[in-house]
A protein has these predicted regions:
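Conserved Class I S-adenosyl-L-methionine
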Residues: 169-246
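Residues at the starts of beta-strands that form the adenosine-phosphate
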Residues: 45, 66, 134
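Conserved catalytic/acceptor-binding region of the Class I
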Residues: 120-189
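Class I SAM-dependent methyltransferase SAM/SAH-binding core
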Residues: 53-96
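Conserved class I S-adenosyl-L-methionine
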Residues: 1-50
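A short SAM/SAH-binding and catalytic strip from SAM-dependent methyltransferases
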Residues: 105-119
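A short acidic, Gly/Pro-enriched loop at the edge of an enzyme's catalytic core
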Residues: 95-106
Length: 246
């Protein structure tokens, strides 16, 4: 039986395709050093799980011999292939990965692990990984040590999926993997009030909201960033987690 939470999760998970081009333009990329740490030398054949528009795929391609993006949303796959000539995105999900057993050196997941059915996904990820292969979820998170960023998060936290961005901190990846290691990387992007509105408009809670709610959220964002001037730095922390297949 499907619960309301599961229905909400599925609706949000598949909402991004309608804004694929905007997502591609405004979501931050990942520091190369964060990806290199996540791979830990397992860089021959890397699978980007829940690849979206290919933000992480591009960075993986800079440090790995072969990258295989996997994405369930056709709109996101089309955008990925448009921005990464020669790369073919495979249709699939964390619960049904289109790869043979023991053929992948590393599986990375950028901004995606919180959408997975973890029990099923852990088994599938372990199936496709070679012995000793690495699984590494990654998140770009706004740096809430900065006061205005914390205020922004406080304003919209209740609209995100429960546990979003925090559910790996004390987790394991099941009996098929060893202990989870973690590391963080600080970085920032230069943006504007319009850029912040565009960033919020790519969030699942905005994409699935009604028009009145969207207008209210947009006004709130503009109010929060108005004191920051025409351009300002949006600070991020990239959180990386990795564990090795036993």
């Amino acid at each position: 039986m499907t619960t309301n939470l599961e229905r909400d999760r599925n609706q949000q998970r598949l909402s991004f395709g309608q804004a694929a081009a905007a997502y591609d333009e405004i979501r931050p990329s990942y520091p190369r050093e964060a990806v290199a740490w996540s791979l830990d030398g397992h860089d021959r054949t890397v699978l980007d799980l829940g690849a979206g528009t290919g933000l992480l795929t591009l960075v993986i391609g800079q440090v790995a011999e072969t990258v295989i993006p996997v994405e369930p949303d056709p709109g996101m796959r089309a955008q990925l292939e448009a921005r990464t000539p020669g790369v073919i995105a495979r249709a699939g999900s964390a619960e049904q990965i289109p790869a043979d057993d023991s053929t992948i050196d590393a599986v990375l997941a950028g901004q995606a692990y919180h959408w997975f059915d973890h029990e099923k996904a852990h088994v599938e990820i372990a199936r496709v990984l070679k012995p000793g292969g690495v699984f590494a979820p990654i998140w770009n998170i706004r740096d809430e040590r900065v006061a205005w960023v914390q205020a922004l998060s406080d304003a919209f936290e209740g609209r995100a999926m429960p546990g979003y961005n925090r559910q790996v901190e004390k987790a394991t990846f099941g009996d098929l993997f060893g202990p989870v290691e973690a590391r963080r990387f600080d970085h920032s992007v230069t943006t504007t009030a319009d850029g912040m509105v565009a960033l919020m408009s790519s969030r699942s809670y905005f994409l699935t909201a009604d028009d009145d709610t969207r207008q209210a959220m947009t006004a709130k964002v503009r109010d929060l960033v108005a004191p920051l001037g025409d351009q300002f730095e949006l600070p991020y922390v990239t959180y990386c987690f990795r564990a090795y297949k036993l």
